[in-house]
Amino acid sequence: MVNVKKGVLVTSDPAFRQLLIHLDDSRQLGSKFIVRELDDTHLFIEKEIVPMLENKVEQIMENMNPEAVDK
């Protein structure tokens, strides 16, 4: 049997990859979104989650360094 999913290949440094894994494990976006962990710098994630993931990462970055955010 073959399963097919539309997804996006994400390339990142290992630290950001760990952040994505944490968001996935804690289901902070409502559900798990990582389809497959490929290696230390690549993840395959569900395509539909990308806009929500971008917003969540932007929110995290703003909270970490509010002065660096363009207003």
Curated annotation (Swiss-Prot):
SUPFAM superfamilies on file: TFB5-like
Database matches in Pfam families: Tfb5
UniProt keyword annotation of Nucleus present: yes
Subcellular location(s) of the protein: Nucleus; Chromosome
Effect of gene knockout: Auxin-induced degradation of the protein causes no obvious phenotype in germ cells and early embryos.
GO CC entries: chromosome; transcription factor TFIIH core complex; transcription factor TFIIH holo complex
Disulfide bond positions: none
Principal location class: nucleus
GO BP annotations, alphabetical order: nucleotide-excision repair; nucleotide-excision repair, preincision complex assembly; transcription by RNA polymerase II; transcription initiation at RNA polymerase II promoter
Alphabetical list of InterPro entries matching this protein: TFB5-like_sf (IPR035935), TFIIH_TTDA/Tfb5 (IPR009400)
Keywords linked to the UniProt accession: Chromosome, DNA damage, DNA repair, Nucleus, Transcription, Transcription regulation
NADP keyword on record: no
Family in the record: Belongs to the TFB5 family.
Subunit structure: Component of the 7-subunit TFIIH core complex.
Purpose of the protein: Component of the general transcription and DNA repair factor IIH (TFIIH) core complex, which is involved in general and transcription-coupled nucleotide excision repair (NER) of damaged DNA and in RNA transcription by RNA polymerase II. In NER, TFIIH acts by opening DNA around the lesion to allow the excision of the damaged oligonucleotide and its replacement by a new DNA fragment. In transcription, TFIIH has an essential role in transcription initiation. When the pre-initiation complex (PIC) has been established, TFIIH is required for promoter opening and promoter escape.
Name this protein carries in UniProt: General transcription and DNA repair factor IIH subunit TFB5
